Amino acid sequence: MSWSPLSREAPFKYIRQAIKLFQQRNGKVIVEIGCIRQRFNHPIEQEPQDCPSRLDGHSTVHFASTGAQFFSVDISKAHINLAKELTAGHQNTIIQQIDGIKFLKNFFKPIDLLFLDAWDVEIPDSAERHLEAYEVAKKHMSPQGLILIDDCDVGMVEGKLAPAVNLYGGKGEKVVPVAQNEGWKVLMRGRCVLLSRQ
């Protein structure tokens, strides 16, 4: 059977596990770089099966639902507007249209959960941009901090999205090895990579 981007694993279980650990560690602040892009037609607490946007994790809504201080940023006005609509009523949620790296350079709260999901894998410098975001954010990560990175199961081969050829691909290709060298541990690996300082 030939591989298709549509046959990929959904990020749901990784997002749920990151939230579970965040709550067990009494986390206070979540930062998401790259917010929700599509609507969904299923209850948010259920893993999507037949939802057309099944491969999107709807992370923005999951994180807003925790009640923690939640900051989500994106450069797309359309994505920001959708995120604001879908998280309306969540008191501790701040959605902002700004470049993720610029945001992180001006963010000074301790981060308990960082989600890196901004520059699409198809963008030539996606891995480098996510590494830059990590480098800026790491000094703000709390001692019990978690980092979740989406789209680590794919890469670009001959100009097309394909399964990752390295252990960590896509958005985590550069971040994960650097973070591991700095003491971060991989808790989960697949569609997403979940890293922990503990």
Model region roles, listed by residue range:
Residues 2-14:
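Conserved SAM-binding loop and adjacent beta-strand
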Residues 6-9, 48-51, 93-95, 122-126, ...:
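Short, flexible loop segments at the rims of nucleotide/cofactor-binding pockets, characterized by
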Residues 16-104:
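SAM cofactor-binding core of SAM-dependent methyltransferases
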Residues 31-33, 73, 114-118, 147-151:
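Active-site flanking residues adjacent to catalytic metal/cofactor-binding acidic residues
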Residues 37-40, 120-123, 153-155:
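Short acidic, S/G/P-rich loop/turn micro-motifs used as interaction or catalytic elements
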Residues 106-113:
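A short acidic, Gly/Pro-enriched loop at the edge of an enzyme's catalytic core
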Residues 113-127:
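A short SAM/SAH-binding and catalytic strip from SAM-dependent methyltransferases
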Residues 124-198:
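C-terminal substrate-binding/active-site "lid" region of AdoMet-derived donor-dependent transferases
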